């Protein structure tokens, strides 16, 4: 491949190198004051090109202040937002529950902090505590309106109940969560997974199709759909779903596995970490009642 470096219309470097993704190549030139353009070509075609840009000093984001201690935050709302921030960026120095719990000291019925604690306890496998927080949050949110504008609280409680083995109740809460359009994809995906685990294949297919009308890129929907078709003996439809899904995402590991390829070929083309990838696949299949897969 040919590497060319230019600045102000002048060629600073022109050389041919052998590029290998596993071995970086270093080339040297005298750095000018002007901005540099680096172009890589092969057989007359541009493979890659990069031009330096002068930083825009006016558009630099403001420097963020360090996170305050929970006791230093003024209100329950701010504590809730601080907890969300810590949760989102996974700050190793602090856990989000410190902010949510402090928020609940200020306002024991603060719905956001209650839901934050429900999600936190769920991830920590403190399921009884998680259920308590989630139910308190829903009670608060539905004080004046039974149809709240977000399905997140119902969905979170559904996840907790399903983890506790209370599948029938979880199913009902997933359906309630799906009343809100923004929650249809995730809530009906879990509903369809439970349908499949119950061997209720027609319902699983119907609910999966509902998911796909709201989220065509949902990663679990084609898996549930293909397995349901197979269970009904409709192997051609199942194969079509798997093939279409793999055309859309050639790295979809569950669909690759269900396509029937050999185990050796499956692992030889896996770019992700095998142990974590196979664990993720196993957890998804188990949630569908597909231990045999």
Residue ranges and their predicted role:
Residues 1-74, 243-269:
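Long, contiguous interaction/recruitment modules in multidomain scaffold/adaptor proteins
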Residues 84-85, 119, 159, 193, ...:
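Residue-level recognition of tetratricopeptide repeat
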Residues 106, 140-146, 180, 214, ...:
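Structural marker of alpha-solenoid helical repeat scaffolds
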Residues 113, 146-147, 153, 187, ...:
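TPR alpha-solenoid repeat register
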């Amino acid at each position: 491949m040919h590497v060319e470096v230019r600045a102000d219309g002048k060629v600073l470097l022109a050389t041919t190198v052998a590029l290998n993704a596993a071995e970086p190549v270093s080339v040297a030139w005298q750095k000018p004051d002007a901005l540099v353009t680096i172009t890589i070509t092969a057989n007359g075609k541009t493979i890659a090109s990069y031009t330096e840009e002068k930083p825009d000093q006016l558009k630099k984001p403001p420097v963020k202040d360090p996170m305050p201690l929970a006791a230093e935050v003024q209100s329950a709302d701010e504590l809730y937002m601080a907890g969300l921030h810590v949760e989102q960026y996974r700050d190793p120095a602090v856990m989000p529950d410190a902010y949510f719990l402090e928020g609940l000291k200020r306002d024991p019925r603060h719905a956001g902090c209650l839901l934050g604690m429900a999600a936190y306890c769920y991830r920590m496998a403190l399921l009884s505590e998680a259920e308590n927080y989630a139910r308190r949050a829903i009670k608060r949110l539905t004080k004046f309106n039974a149809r709240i504008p977000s399905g997140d609280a119902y969905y979170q409680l559904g996840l907790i109940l399903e983890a506790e083995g209370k599948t029938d109740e979880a199913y009902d809460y997933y359906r309630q969560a799906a009343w809100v359009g923004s929650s249809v994809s995730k809530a009906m995906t879990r509903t369809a997974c439970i349908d499949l685990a119950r061997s209720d294949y027609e319902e699983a297919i119907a609910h999966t199709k509902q998911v796909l009308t709201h989220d065509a890129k949902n990663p679990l929907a084609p898996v549930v759909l293909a397995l349901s078709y197979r269970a009904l003996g409709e192997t051609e439809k199942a194969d079509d779903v798997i093939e279409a899904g793999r055309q859309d995402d050639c790295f979809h590991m569950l669909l690759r596995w269900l396509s029937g390829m050999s185990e050796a070929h499956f692992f030889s083309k896996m770019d992700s970490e095998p142990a974590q990838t196979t664990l993720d696949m196993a957890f998804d299949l188990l949630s569908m009642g597909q231990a045999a897969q």
